[in-house]
Amino acid sequence: DKQLDADVSPKPTIFLPSIAETKLQKAGTYLCLLEKFFPDVIKIHWQEKKSNTILGSQEGNTMKTNDTYMKFSWLTVPEKSLDKEHRCIVRHENNKNGVDQEIIFPPIKTDVITMDPKDNCSKDANDTLLLQLTNTSAYYMYLLLLLKSVVYFAIITCCLLRRTAFCCNGEKS
């Protein structure tokens, strides 16, 4: 057995259900990714926030990554349970103070606010038109400034060449 000096308790990353999943499937999947732990023995279970009942969940295999391990677990809940808080409970020998790690998954708001599409579209169209006009104006302004600089350069060059030609006819300035 290899002992690591660093903190090797599980580091959680949580993933919440997508809006598309909750609308199409009428359910949501919470995913808990646990990384950088050692040794590989780990127990994971899920519960609702104020309940001790263990919920049915699934787990991936424990995978070795460099000198540590990673594992993921997921819980799929029906639409009616999405407004409840859920917990992923992780038991590992290197948890701080030997206490089970509790990862909280917030409730998912399933109500969607609808807006009048006519109001929103006309505002977006006006904003787009204004942005387009601003960009076009800026483009033509820079083009005009560039043209002015080229004309100015040509005039100065002609003046300097005439002066040089006039001065070089035997006269010294």
UniProtKB/Swiss-Prot annotation:
Molecular function as annotated in GO: small molecule binding
Key word Signal present: no
Domain of life: Eukaryota
Membrane-traversing stretches: 139-161
Pfam families attached to this UniProt entry: C1-set
One GO BP annotation of this record: adaptive immune response
Disulfides per UniProt: 32-88
GO CC terms of this entry: external side of plasma membrane; gamma-delta T cell receptor complex; plasma membrane
Subcellular location: Cell membrane
Glycosylated residues, chain numbering: 66, 120, 126, 135
Keywords per UniProt: Adaptive immunity, Cell membrane, Disulfide bond, Glycoprotein, Immunity, Immunoglobulin domain, Membrane, Receptor, T cell receptor, Transmembrane, Transmembrane helix
Residue span(s) of domain Ig-like: 10-104
PROSITE patterns the UniProt entry points to: IG_LIKE
Function of the protein: Constant region of T cell receptor (TR) gamma chain that participates in the antigen recognition. Gamma-delta TRs recognize a variety of self and foreign non-peptide antigens frequently expressed at the epithelial boundaries between the host and external environment, including endogenous lipids presented by MH-like protein CD1D and phosphoantigens presented by butyrophilin-like molecule BTN3A1. Upon antigen recognition induces rapid, innate-like immune responses involved in pathogen clearance and tissue repair.
Quaternary state and interactors: Gamma-delta TR is a heterodimer composed of a gamma and delta chain; disulfide-linked. The gamma-delta TR is associated with the transmembrane signaling CD3 coreceptor proteins following the stoichiometry: a single gamma-delta TR heterodimer associates with one CD3D-CD3E heterodimer, one CD3G-CD3E heterodimer and one CD247 homodimer forming a stable octameric structure. Upon activation, gamma-delta TR complex associates with FCER1G to initiate intracellular signaling.
Protein name: T cell receptor gamma constant 1
Species this chain originates from: Homo sapiens (Human)
